[in-house]
């Protein structure tokens, strides 16, 4: 059975927000009210559809007493009851608790792991993969920091991705990505295994994380390129150290002002993510519903180039379409992970 009391509360809350919007709320309240209203609108539509079908079923049942209408009523009841499970499932999905960060932009961080230069090259391949996927979704992809290796790989990459549902769709990408292939630097044709670490963080606003000025140290320096050479002659690069946690963030684009803003945005995201992770750990029951443990050290995926195979170890998904995947066609993987997480959360609620 669906929780009727909760359905009533949701509809009443939606009607209250609608009345507030029509009355013209204060300027500082408009954004929050509009956001909550937009989130509840599709849920209320699902509730209305479910209630309408329930009413149609009651009317059809009443018609069974009429001998002349009985056959028609039975046909109508069969049709309505056949569609009811799918409708109730959709409503249960709509009622699942939302991750408050799902609608936020995301900060993407990629770093090579074990494997030396080959790991750096693979990190660069992952960066290109996510960039292409973002472009295919119509999202904005902004590089915040990019440090190249000697052979053109990636030592460190940070990007901001903005668009509809960015964090909701990319949050399952955090973890260790392993690659098996013959490196470009390998003359003997032997397959090597290396790895890169991906972190996807929800962007945090200043109101989410309070960072006192006394808690940070800001250093400026010259930006360096591959091999350590200076790419400009001014001290435009910015390094921010968060003293209480030891977190260090660097941004080395051309504008010092922009670098400071970029580095602070990443620092806020990391601190916000730490707080979210801490809260998640305290909700042990909820952790069971997540795809994987959320641990950045967890190996989540293997890319086997000789076999053209990608395997996501968390859900046992294997696709023999590695060329397309590396070109950014990861929608099937993203949707499978989201569906698995959704099913687990529904099961946890006793569906």
From Swiss-Prot:
Keywords: Cytoplasm, Methylation, Protein biosynthesis
PTM annotation (N5-methylglutamine): residues: 229
SUPFAM superfamilies membership: Release factor (SSF75620)
Domain of life according to the entry: Bacteria
Name of one Pfam family that matches: PCRF
PTM annotation, UniProt: Methylated by PrmC. Methylation increases the termination efficiency of RF1.
Classification via PROSITE patterns: RF_PROK_I
Function: Peptide chain release factor 1 directs the termination of translation in response to the peptide chain termination codons UAG and UAA.
Family in the record: Belongs to the prokaryotic/mitochondrial release factor family.
PANTHER family in alphabetical order: LD18447P (PTHR43804:SF7)
Protein name, per record: Peptide chain release factor 1
Gene name tied to this protein: prfA
